[in-house]
Curated annotation (Swiss-Prot):
PANTHER family: IMIDAZOLE GLYCEROL PHOSPHATE SYNTHASE SUBUNIT HISH (PTHR42701:SF1). The gene is hisH. This is Imidazole glycerol phosphate synthase subunit HisH. Pathway: Amino-acid biosynthesis; L-histidine biosynthesis; L-histidine from 5-phospho-alpha-D-ribose 1-diphosphate: step 5/9. InterPro entries: Class_I_gatase-like, GATASE, Imidazole-glycPsynth_HisH. Keywords: Amino-acid biosynthesis, Cytoplasm, Glutamine amidotransferase, Histidine biosynthesis, Hydrolase, Lyase. The active site is at residues 79, 187, 189. GO terms for biological process: L-histidine biosynthetic process.
Amino acid sequence: MLGIIDYGMGNLHSVSKALERLSWSYIVSEQPEELQKADGLILPGVGSFHDAMSILNETGLTAFIKDWVDEGKPLLGICLGMQLLFEESEENKRTKGLSLLPGRVIRFPGVATDGSTYKVPHMGWNQLTFRKPNHPLLTDVEEGHVYFVHSYVVKTDADDVLLATSHYYETVPAVVGRGNILGTQFHPEKSSNVGMSILRNYGAMVEKGVKARG
């Protein structure tokens, strides 16, 4: 069973509907004792990094998520939820993240290297380029287009966490992962067959982990 973390800033309806289409059982809760019943967690998110971390800290969900990951259980961050996995964001000068993956989150500058300006946010369909096509999250997934909506982008020197990238005037980390910590910058639940395949694979990884733990 999957658990969707409800902290007031997630695209809960669309994620829930996607899991229903895949016939995965799930719960939606903000209570750690309820979420503890799940086998894998999804951290959705839309909006401000600063506001999201404030809520997670105030509700005790930050500590719960870190303990969950330390126990080796799977976590998938979506959109803002992926960005929260990293160390910090420059939003509101500096906001500390969950620090589960190395890197920081900065705003798209809106100015290309040739001096031309471009639109922020990065919004719409864009092509994936796989860095680690054999990763279980990308098994049998088409290297196709997915749906992005974001004004901030992850910067990391840790190439090992980049499972797939996209390009919007610069390299955009699109799928990240290290061990049981995974994330997508785009919305898989809004990304047609490619996105649904990734969600299906995440569910399969969770299921496999349950069997491995006995």
